[in-house]
Regions:
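DNA major-groove recognition helix of helix-turn-helix
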Residues: 15, 40, 51
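The alpha-helix within a helix-turn-helix
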Residues: 15, 26, 56
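Short, basic-rich loop-to-helix N-cap that marks the start of a DNA-contacting helix
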Residues: 43-57
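A short, Lys/Arg-rich alpha-helix, primarily the initiator
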Residues: 1-21
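Short alpha-helical DNA-recognition segment
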Residues: 19-38
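Residues that mark the N-terminal boundary/hinge immediately upstream of a DNA-recognition element
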Residues: 10, 21, 48-51, 62
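Short, charged recognition helix plus adjacent turn
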Residues: 68-87
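Alpha-helical DNA-recognition elements
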Residues: 38, 42, 54, 72
Length: 87
């Protein structure tokens, strides 16, 4: 599985666990709606760490908790995480 697909599925699963919509994530976290949509759909070629950080902060979990999921066990392209956390 590609990293972008695993990230998208993980965000989708976390939203479902919290009975939360992409719109609520946008409203609560200030993350652009288009960014959330493209992230959940796994359409990014690269995954921005800043984006993942904003999402996990809004959901109230850590980056470690986000990536500690079996979805990431078979990720093939870990090298495409882009960016530095600025928080």
């Amino acid at each position: 599985m590609k990293l972008s697909e695993a990230v998208g599925k993980r965000v989708e699963n976390l939203l479902a666990e919290r009975n939360m919509t992409q719109y609520q994530l946008y409203k609560n976290g200030g993350i652009p709606r288009s960014t959330i949509s493209v992230t959940v759909d796994g359409k990014y070629k690269t995954v921005k760490l800043d984006t993942i950080y904003q999402i996990v902060a809004t959901l109230g979990i850590t980056l470690k908790e986000f990536f500690d999921d079996t979805l990431f066990d078979d990720v093939e392209d870990w090298g495409i995480i882009e960016g530095v956390i600025r928080y």
